[in-house]
Amino acid sequence: IFSTKPDGKPVLSDKETNIYELDYKEIRSYDVGLRGHSGFPDQNKVASFKPLLSDVIDLISAFRLSFSSKSFGLNIELKSLPFEYNVSQPEPFEFVSLVLKELYLIDSQVNIVLQSFDVNVLQILHSERQAFRYFDVSFLVEPEDDNEIDSNLEKLGFKPDIWSPNFSVLSKTKVDYLHQKGIKVIPWTVNEISDMSQMLNLGCDGIITDYPDRAIAYIKK
């Protein structure tokens, strides 16, 4: 819990306010940067607010113009839970439609990856990309489900571009098996240098990390 109410008082429970019931003006009035996050003690405490996806896209697009590399991409997670449909989030089809609407005008040279743990969301993403500019679909996998690769693929109903498990349950055998199926492997959430090195040795195609500065420094060694 790291948010602050408009009156300066801290938000004490994640159930205290349902932002799905607020308009954006109300959401923006909550600070989400000054209190800091206990999980990231080195993070600078800066006054901030939850931006719109469109604002993030505009910021990234402007930054890309000054970026020397042609390789540039967006990796967006659609956080979704079936028991939260119409409670704290839209139904999957509406959710996906709202996100794709914001992504529609992005330069086609920008690579887009859309990921989720929710199979319903992933299935809609897969069906909708036929009428949309191409993007990769990434299946985020809970640790307890990672040993059931084939049954999860069967449940999903299509071959995702990327398989994203928790890094702690990965093995060389699993990575090789997924590669044989033509599926990239990008585990989450790899924060320690030693674990980054291990994932590289396993043959992973990338990692998800809270510390890109560490990853960049490691790669440059």
Predicted regions mapped to residue ranges:
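Metal-dependent phosphodiesterase/phospholipase catalytic core, i.e.
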Residues: 1-136, 140, 158-159, 165, ...
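C-terminal active-site rim and adjoining tail of enzyme catalytic domains
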Residues: 132-221
